[in-house]
């Protein structure tokens, strides 16, 4: 099932924002809800559409789209407690200040791609989970504020969490927040509606 079938409102919003003008897209996005996998899918799809060099279709096979589907695009980075750690970073339970510094250093140089940083939690088995005060601590979040507040063109930050309150208020205030229901919640809602009518 396509994202547009599962999440018509969100898909339409982001498709319209991206087709109108890339500048219409918020440069800091926060997805929240119970389904971290759906949030991650949305985040990678936004990254794919921002970097597609062809027709932006669901099955596009341009190099950028293939890289993003393979999670190997050089400008689309998942930032978690286990992903994209600098060599000298031995923290295993948090997104670290060293990762924040790595992002800042990466943004100093120009890129031919639209850079997307997806912040989430991921365990050793690859399971995606949302950010929370334990894995995305205030010190790290605060160290990112300047680059989120004054982002360069061609850079998007996406934060995934279960509850909005689990992310520092200063990140929330600089982000556009979207609730991503789990597909089970959507199915349940449709069943309730069909039961009434």
Q: Over which residues does each language-model region extend?
A:
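A short helix-turn-beta junction within AAA+ P-loop NTPase domains corresponding to the substrate/partner-engaging
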Residues: 169-185
């Amino acid at each position: 099932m396509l994202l547009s079938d599962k999440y018509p409102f969100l898909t339409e919003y982001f498709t319209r924002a991206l087709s109108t003008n890339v500048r219409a897209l918020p440069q800091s996005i926060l997805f929240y809800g119970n389904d971290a996998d759906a949030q991650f899918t949305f985040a990678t799809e936004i990254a794919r559409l921002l970097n597609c060099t062809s027709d932006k279709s669901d099955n596009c096979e341009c190099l950028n789209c293939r890289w993003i589907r393979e999670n190997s695009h050089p400008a689309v980075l998942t930032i978690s407690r286990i992903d994209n750690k600098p060599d000298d970073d031995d923290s295993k339970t948090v997104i670290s200040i060293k990762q924040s510094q790595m992002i800042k250093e990466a943004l100093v140089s120009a890129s031919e791609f639209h850079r997307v940083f997806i912040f989430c939690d991921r365990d050793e088995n690859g399971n995606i989970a949302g950010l929370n005060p334990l894995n995305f601590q205030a010190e790290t979040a605060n160290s990112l504020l300047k680059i989120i507040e004054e982002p360069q063109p061609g850079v998007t930050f996406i934060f995934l969490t279960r509850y909005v309150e689990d992310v520092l208020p200063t990140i929330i205030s600089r982000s556009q927040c979207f609730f991503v229901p789990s597909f089970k919640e959507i199915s349940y809602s449709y069943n309730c509606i069909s039961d009434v009518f």
